[in-house]
From Swiss-Prot:
GO terms, biological process: proteolysis
SUPFAM superfamilies, per the entry: Clavaminate synthase-like
Name recorded for this polypeptide: Bifunctional peptidase and (3S)-lysyl hydroxylase Jmjd7
Binding site for Fe cation: H178, D180, H277
A GO cellular component annotation in the UniProt record: cytoplasm
Catalytic activity as recorded in UniProt: L-lysyl-[protein] + 2-oxoglutarate + O2 = (3S)-3-hydroxy-L-lysyl-[protein] + succinate + CO2
Keywords recorded for this protein, A-Z: Aminopeptidase, Cytoplasm, Disulfide bond, Hydrolase, Iron, Metal-binding, Monooxygenase, Nucleus, Oxidoreductase, Protease
Function recorded in the entry: Bifunctional enzyme that acts both as an endopeptidase and 2-oxoglutarate-dependent monooxygenase. Endopeptidase that cleaves histones N-terminal tails at the carboxyl side of methylated arginine or lysine residues, to generate 'tailless nucleosomes', which may trigger transcription elongation. Preferentially recognizes and cleaves monomethylated and dimethylated arginine residues of histones H2, H3 and H4. After initial cleavage, continues to digest histones tails via its aminopeptidase activity. Additionally, may play a role in protein biosynthesis by modifying the translation machinery.
UniProt EC number: 1.14.11.63, 3.4.-.-
SMART domains: JmjC (SM00558)
Cofactor(s) for this UniProt protein: Fe(2+)
Domain JmjC positions: 128-307
A Pfam match: Cupin_8
The organism of origin for this protein: Mus musculus (Mouse)
């Protein structure tokens, strides 16, 4: 009896993503030719938890014309910022039986630009990606080139963003598959970003494990070693690389259906809360994103229930 009930729950979880795709999940990420009104944004995108790419949302930003590598060098070249340094471009990712975070260095922007342009060398891959509102805290000189928030989104969501983040890196810098509890407005100023997306309803097919947290340390010889963070609790993370999934180890992932999209200069991606995303970029891409805290409403509760059942039934 208990085994039959457990199997019924497994079957329901496995069938749920297809039902969600038929009812609400888009097959491709749609484009809007202009920013929506606050009402339309909430009604058509936030409430149904659907992504979209918005054109002509940044045209009034001076940054769109100004921000080049040479402009950054002239404007903020001497400014030191937090830089993630990894041997392979993967910060905050599973490596073996560890969840490994990047080494962090305080480096002048000019040095990062020198490395990007091939004028200097630095061990590993550099990525300006500090996700704690690093734009206003570390690069306030650039704030006049953008907006401090997205007015129509702030009105729609009834709040200001929790964080405004600045991103700069080369094509080797990759963000591993994960999800956030934020309504994310991701704005590409120069270059392009490549997103692989999964809706929250794909959770039964996406594996999670618990990993010992660790950090890369950069040695004086320019090599990397992995050092455990013994004071931290284990971290739940996705071990799978969606670009080259090991379907022998994670066969259920073959049933997930990813959406792929490219966000180009001048475009804004609305990435809804709880959507899984994996991100790559063009060399020297410059971007800004706004994190608005999600509403912890019924959608969040339903996702937590699905997540708990997925783990309890052993699907992941």
């Amino acid at each position: 009896m208990a085994e039959a009930a457990l199997e019924a729950v497994r079957r329901a979880l496995q069938e749920f993503p297809a039902a969600a795709r038929d009812l609400n999940v888009p097959r491709v990420v749609p484009y809007l030719d202009e920013p929506p009104s606050p009402l339309c944004f909430y009604r058509d995108w936030v409430c149904p938890n659907r992504p979209c790419i918005i054109r002509n949302a940044l045209q009034h930003w001076p940054a769109l014309q100004k921000w080049s590598l040479s402009y950054l060098r002239a404007t903020v070249g001497s400014t030191e910022v937090s830089v993630a340094v990894t041997p392979d471009g993967y910060a905050d990712a599973v490596r073996g039986d560890r969840f490994v975070m990047p080494a962090e260095r305080r480096l002048p922007i000019s040095h990062v630009l020198d490395v990007l342009e091939g004028r200097a060398q630095h061990p590993g891959v550099l990525y300006v990606q500090k996700q704690c509102s690093n734009l206003p805290t570390e690069l306030p000189q650039l704030l006049s080139d953008i907006e401090s928030h997205v007015p129509w989104a702030s009105e729609s969501l009834g709040k200001m963003p929790d964080a405004v983040n600045f991103w700069l890196g080369d094509a080797s810098a990759v963000t591993s598959l994960h999800k956030d509890h934020y309504e994310n407005l991701y704005c590409v100023v120069s270059g392009e970003k490549h997103f692989l997306l999964h809706p929250p309803s794909d959770r039964p097919f996406i594996p999670y494990n618990l990993y010992t947290p660790a950090t890369y340390q950069l040695t004086e010889e320019g090599t990397f070693r992995v050092v455990d963070e013994e004071a931290m609790e284990k971290v739940p993370w996705i071990p799978l690389d969606p670009l080259a999934p090991d379907l022998t180890q994670y066969p259920s992932y073959s049933q997930a259906q990813a959406l792929h999209c490219t966000v180009r200069a001048g475009e804004m991606l609305y990435l809804p809360a709880l959507w899984f995303h994996h991100v790559q970029q063009s060399h020297g891409c410059i971007a800004v994103n706004f994190w608005y805290d999600m509403e912890y409403d019924l959608k969040y509760s339903y996702f937590q229930l699905m997540d708990t059942l997925t783990r309890a039934t052993g699907l992941d």
